[in-house]
Amino acid sequence: LKPCEDMQLECIFPEEPMEIVRAETVETAPIGTTMFVLGYKCKPASGLENLKKELLATLALKVLTHVTSPLYQGMLKDGLINETFSTEIFNGDDFFVPMLEGESKDPYAVRERIFAAVEEAAKNGLDETLFENSRKNAYGSLIMKFNNVEAVANLMINSAMSGIAPFDTVTMLSSLTIEDANRWLREELLPQQATLSIMKNQD
């Protein structure tokens, strides 16, 4: 990447408090099935620290909500979720929000199941075997992308925009441990930092 002329642009953001605005938001729309997003407002980071948090959050949520996990199987068996259930990390220099989302007849019950699963994992730790399998799978998928010119170009651009080197993700991913993931989960996935957004059908 060739650096361009510095135009002296400055982005100024107001200071963001750690407290959430509200614990839940409910909206209505002409939809067939109620949809929800449960997000956790976590401490923001930048550069390598942001990369580490993103990887840890991705792996921790993947283990917590894996299709073979007690959380996923329990909610599926009780009809609380379907195949749309997924996780996502929404983050940048000044925000970091892990999200769990999908369709449900009872989003409040889903929230309580997730809270209970997080509390259990914080106490006893995540499944180490599943964590290692998920980490190695992510590592392999990342390495495979290096065979694609477009993927490498996107990696270079995204890395430059994030203030990290193109191969920092590979290095960071290979060094993460189950202890790192458990620590992140205990410190960041706090019920008081969670907010539930619900979109339900208009009556």
Mark where each language-model region is:
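An aromatic/glycine/proline-enriched structural segment found at the starts
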Residues: 1-46, 203
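A generic structural signal for well-ordered coil/turn residues at beta-strand boundaries
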Residues: 20-22, 31-34, 58, 94-96, ...
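Bilobed periplasmic-binding protein-like "clamshell/Venus-flytrap" ligand-binding domains
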Residues: 182-198
